[in-house]
Amino acid sequence: MKDILIVIPARMSSSRLPGKPLINIAGLPMIHHVWNRALQVTSSDNIVVATEDNEIIDYCITNDINCILTDKAASEVDRVKLVSDKIAAKIYICACGDEPLINVEDIKTIIAKSDSSKNQFIIGRKSIDENEFNDPSKAKIVFDEQNRVLYASRAGIPVDYKGQFQKAHKAIWIHSYTKNVLDSYFSQGLCSAESLDGLSIHRFLQIGIPVYCIDLIGDSWAVDEPKDIKIVEDRLRNLH
């Protein structure tokens, strides 16, 4: 059994940017950038690309990237669960395949805070300004003094008693969980809040799995539509 397994979920179907895992960004397909970032955290034996698409599998095999073909999955968490059925690990880390700038130190931080003896779900967080607060593409989280998440929403939360923004945090989608947690999540099926805004965190909260959030650098940039490609390429260029 592996101590950790970094799973990179990827799929070709995307309403805003079809085929995005294999889109060329600064000379490499996006999925290859994420793989290279993960390699700065651990050895290749502890990393796998998980997908339902043969095109991605073919690319990975040709380029010596570990990969696994899964059934179709409703979310990245569901896909990690499918991987956990085939590859045993104490801790599974989800590093989203559409983030070619995923921060290596953030992955290391999530791993360091993970505990295979506890049934918990760990995600990252970052403070945000009012623009991101009002952006429904950003998932906002509210947490207590023990960093346990109380609620999440695409709406702007929390607000003060006048309904105004004061301070807030968004979720950073690097996750960690055990096999037991993934099995519990998968066995419950979609909950009502999750079906409303597409945030898998709701299901963990509904079934009583503790969700903890930790501060991350959070300077990645997800590629969701064509305009994001240039942003990422510019950032990559500035790194060299």
Indicate where each model-derived feature is located.
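Conserved core of the sugar-phosphate nucleotidyltransferase
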Residues: I102-C191
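Short, high-confidence coil segments that cap the C-terminus of an alpha-helix
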Residues: S44, A89, S116-N119
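Conserved alpha/beta core of the MobA/IspD/sugar-nucleotide pyrophosphorylase nucleotidyltransferase superfamily
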Residues: A74-S75, Q166-H240
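A structural signal for short hydrophobic beta-strand segments in well-ordered beta-sheet cores
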Residues: L22, I141-V142, C213
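N-terminal glycine-rich phosphate-binding loop and ensuing alpha1 helix
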Residues: K2-A50
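Hydrophobic/aromatic residues located in beta-strands of well-ordered beta-sheets
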Residues: I6, I47-V49, Y92, V149, ...
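Short phosphate-binding loop-to-helix
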Residues: V48, N54-A112
